[in-house]
Amino acid sequence: MSTNLQTQAFAGNPIRSKTPKSTDPFSPTSALESLKTRLLDNTLHCQPQKHHSSLSSSSSSSPDFKVLPFRKGRPLTYSGPGETAPVWHLGWISLGDCKIFLANSGIELKEEALVYLGSRSADDVVYWAIDVSDGDSLASEFGSKQLCFVELRTVMVATDWADQRAMADLAIAGHARALLEWHNVSRFCGHCGEKTIPKEAGKLKQCSNASCKKRIYPRVDPVVIMLVIDRENDRVLLSRQSRFVPRMWSCIAGFIEPGESLEEAVRRETWEETGIEVGEVVYHTSQPWPVGPNSMPCQLMVGFYAYAKSFEINVDKEELEGT
């Protein structure tokens, strides 16, 4: 079966290249040390940028750092002038502007709140994300600059998938949200219960208990999603849940269980939800999915074609509204 599906949402992050060596100034460790110095530098207290269109350019106050604020899982964005429909662009701000915005909201900028996203050595820029969910007044503070926090799903839907730059921004925002939400749900050690602290610029966490020191890495939850078809390629099985908007349909999908292969998960989920028996399972592609529940912010969707062996549908009403 030939299908032109070459673009994957949240994939193709341009700043997630090979991790630089620790001695490289753009590595997480070196960049964090430089960040600490700048956090203590009073020259960061400059005037905020007045025009949102300049937020993606280098700032004279901290030309080698750009910060993307998030509030309750939503990235800071702006919509360009003259656009008939909202086309959201990431609201990057300088480190100096970030300090000013937070100070105006009574929030102390802490090292632990920042997460390293990546770098572009050619542009002499290191990118960070920060969770500002505790700043209740930040929405109006950024709103005065024509910036707003938008749900990542909304950004995804509004993104032009033929625009490589827009898709790259979507991938960066997805990576940032996944890391920040993982930090939010990993505040305590699962082994001893003590608090965890970020390490390597937020790439991992470690238990603060000196007798434990368990290292915790971002968890990835694998999900199978399958297009169930017949051998003649003239029938396809789609489903809908009660929470879907009208006329919205989806492929069957579900989480992989312990001790289960990807192919087994495809067959089990299809059978459990629709009563359809699946034979051959053919891999298609995969993509990150950082817009799931906050408790599982780092999902990986693995896509398959699944060839049906039976055709009598028996819908699980607890899972689906219909097929």
Predicted regions and their residues:
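Residues immediately within or flanking Cys/His clusters that coordinate Zn2+
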Residues: H183-S186, G193, L204
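Basic (Lys/Arg-enriched) interaction patch that binds polyanionic ligands
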Residues: H191, I197, N209, A265-E273
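Secondary-structure boundary elements
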Residues: G193-K199, I229-D234, E273-E277
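N-terminal strand-loop-strand
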Residues: A201-C251, Y283-H284, A306
